[in-house]
């Protein structure tokens, strides 16, 4: 599977801002919820885990991959991508986040290919910069489709 194949319809979005990290999580996971990749309990599990453990899913400056354990409400494996024009702070000590990659992993293995492809994409500085400065959903989708 190509990386873009993990993104269901309408799962790539650009938003002006989030009021707080909780709303950023909601933005990030809403298309996965609407497309029945997760249930509402999955989103609550991410928020609860963030309060308990901190934002363990911040991958790099400006980039987060919110997710929870499969048994918390993941129904199918898929991803979403939300770019915030104005970054949001998760904690006082962590870098603010601008790009959220929502992950639903239905089991321990089905998302490994997507994570590998995503890691390669994020390690290429020019592509990461292009994601962080994209102006539209189409630009974001084109970058992911070329990965």
Located regions from the model:
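Cytosolic covalent-transfer regions centered on His/Cys nucleophiles
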Residues: 1-147
């Amino acid at each position: 599977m190509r990386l873009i194949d993990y993104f269901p319809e309408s799962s790539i979005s650009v938003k002006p801002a989030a009021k707080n990290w909780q709303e950023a999580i909601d933005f990030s996971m809403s298309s996965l919820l609407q497309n029945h990749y997760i249930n509402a309990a999955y989103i609550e599990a991410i928020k609860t885990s963030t309060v308990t453990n901190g934002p363990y899913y911040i991958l790099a400056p400006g980039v987060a991959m919110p997710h929870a354990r499969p048994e918390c409400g993941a129904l199918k494996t898929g991803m979403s991508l939300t770019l915030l024009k104005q970054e949001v702070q998760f904690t006082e000590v962590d870098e603010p986040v601008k790009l959220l990659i929502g992950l639903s992993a239905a089991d321990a293995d089905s998302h490994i290919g997507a994570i590998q492809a995503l890691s390669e994409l994020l390690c290429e500085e020019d592509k990461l910069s292009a994601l962080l400065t994209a102006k539209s959903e189409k630009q974001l989708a084109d970058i992911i489709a070329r990965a």
